[in-house]
Amino acid sequence: MATFVELSTKAKMPIVGLGTWKSPPNQVKEAVKAAIDAGYRHIDCAYAYCNENEVGEAIQEKIKEKAVQREDLFIVSKLWPTCFEKKLLKEAFQKTLTDLKLDYLDLYLIHWPQGLQPGKELFPKDDQGRILTSKTTFLEAWEGMEELVDQGLVKALGVSNFNHFQIERLLNKPGLKHKPVTNQVECHPYLTQEKLIQYCHSKGISVTAYSPLGSPDRPSAKPEDPSLLEDPKIKEIAAKHEKTSAQVLIRFHIQRNVVVIPKSVTPSRIQENIQVFDFQLSDEEMATILSFNRNWRACLLPETVNMEEYPYDAEY
């Protein structure tokens, strides 16, 4: 079983990475160090997570210790949509690179397709609490990102939270120089994303699954929300393989050739989440897990629902 996915650029992206969304700055440094010690080589970051400085410290410490070399790591970050204008894009990218203490990124993604008004706030709002949008679109942002590739600062580009119509528009953009190599989206047994994955793979675009465990620690979680980790059928499959529910949920993606980035700051869980290459889910088990789909999203970004380009209005 391959431990990586080959991108359209021929680069190898490790199929399991460490997610860092919601990892508090005071804990994320130790989490990244624990992950590198456990064998992770793919770290998923973002400007909007406000913890890249600590992630960078961890990476540098591990490189200094000779535990790992920079070229063995696959580091991903994301451009927030308040920075779609070229000048702001360059500044945001530079901040990410400086915080991570790197001289290049392996992959740089557009975090969200809707352009937002530039400024200090991640979600700029007017007096009525309505989100303020920007006229600069993701297509214009892409041109600025392509320049980063041409300058050798980024190896590959991708998108996140895009539906297939938005990807189609990007692929059909006149003068497109660098195609997206991945679409990072929420994906788990309650949101199996079959049509979107099929579409992306048909275009030579890999898929990365975030919130693979259902994001139980998300800020908007409600007590009545479904819990993947507590799902009796998932627990049953896990018990059969002498694995945990989390390991089954991660393995589910690997067998679909989908990159998966579980988040944890607990060293024992970080280790557990990568111990997923020594068992195989049967075709029957995969079909059972796929049948759990209910198009349930943990991460809706409700602030932007009534704006143009809201990605989840489309079926996929």
Swiss-Prot record:
Its main location: cytoplasm. Substrate binds at H111. It catalyses: an alditol + NAD(+) = an aldose + NADH + H(+); an alditol + NADP(+) = an aldose + NADPH + H(+). It holds the Pfam family Aldo_ket_red. PROSITE patterns: ALDOKETO_REDUCTASE_1, ALDOKETO_REDUCTASE_2, ALDOKETO_REDUCTASE_3. GO terms for molecular function: aldose reductase (NADPH) activity; all-trans-retinol dehydrogenase (NADP+) activity; NADP+ binding; NADPH binding; retinal binding. GO terms for biological process: polyol metabolic process; retinal metabolic process. Induction: By FGF-1. GO terms for cellular component: cytoplasm. InterPro entries: AKR (IPR020471), Aldo/ket_reductase_CS (IPR018170), NADP_OxRdtase_dom (IPR023210), NADP_OxRdtase_dom_sf (IPR036812). It comes from the Eukaryota. Its EC number is 1.1.1.21. The active site is at Y49 (proton donor). The keyword Oxidoreductase applies. It is found in: Cytoplasm. Monomer. Belongs to the aldo/keto reductase family. This is Aldose reductase-related protein 2.
